[in-house]
Amino acid sequence: FIPTLRRTRTLTGTNGQDPIAPSLELTWDEWRSQWTKTDKRKFKYTMVKEGFVLAAPEVGAAYDPYRPDEAHCALTGIVDMELRPVWVYDIDDLTNSYQYSKKRIWVDKELYYTQWVEMYDRRGNLWRTWDDSRWWQPTTGLAMWRSVIIPNVISQRHTILSITSDWDKVDQMDNSLFDVDKLRDRR
């Protein structure tokens, strides 16, 4: 269900690469890829190296490491960063039909979490990057989205998502909330 459009959009394999909503630099595939679902028939996975990445700290509910300057509607403001130990993987498209020829992901060695993503167009040029921060609940290990920054290097546009998590309702969540029929009927 997309509240801003007031409708449910059923995503199929052909439109998973479309923007989730108009004027966003975010496609369903980018959102879904953060769940780290893989398909070895469609993609080749190669560990490139081990190293470090400068990424937003995972600080739980202490504060938001992204503090954009709202007056300028741009990638300005303050972003706290820290060096994180990572494995770097390349995910190469084998179908020649995926929107990206390659994704390079930095997976945190301690948190097992994707810290940074670079996405390359069909010509091999850097197209988009992904950096995010989550709300972490240390006592349970649960996490929810907090902030996502997705710059489009080619068009010089970006999307910033700021999400307010509601921990009070976590215990009320179950798989029925994600059933397509229930989402379609939810008003």
Locate predicted features.
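Gly/Pro-enriched, hydrophobic low-complexity segments
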Residues: 1-37, 71-178
